Amino acid sequence: MKHYKIIDGSEVRGSDLRLPRAISIYRAALAHKQVTVKSCRRKSDGSEVIIMELSRLEIPDEPEFPIHVKEDIAVRCLKEDLNMPEVYAIRKDFPIGLPHSNAMPFAHPVSLCISDVLFADIKPQFNAFDFINLIIRWFNLNSIGELHEKGRPLEVFFQYHNFCG
């Protein structure tokens, strides 16, 4: 796995995570049948990163976009917890420019926009298991070209804290 500055940090055990959002996602990932937790990290800014492998993704034999049946992702939770946890596809050759990818000042890792709902609107009822399922849904639907509604213009956002439609 390639190292990316945005998710690099000191490796920590999952049981040593400190941020409530990271802890809930870590625990949900451990219980999820399609997820294997590979590692956890703490960055110098206090954010925490969970590296996971998603498996048994529902990818057709000839996908619309080159998405694999297994994909590695990183979920980064910020200390302030004001925005949706950041989700990155961390495969070295993961395609850029897919629908519902966030425009960032770097090409890789690819930042995924997994929800078009503002985090402030869902934060009170945030469910880590549902969050993981949204990520899986992103891969499954993008692989068949159905993540983005037909006839709806793509919206480009240049900051991960915005939402995409």
Descriptions of predicted regions:
Residues 158-165:
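Extended, non-transmembrane interaction/recognition domains
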Residues 39-115, 126:
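Compact alpha/beta protein-protein interaction domains typified by the UBC
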Residues 1-66:
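Long, charged/polar, low-complexity intrinsically disordered N-terminal extensions
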Residues 152-158:
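A glycine-rich phosphate-binding loop feature that marks nucleotide/adenosyl-phosphate handling sites
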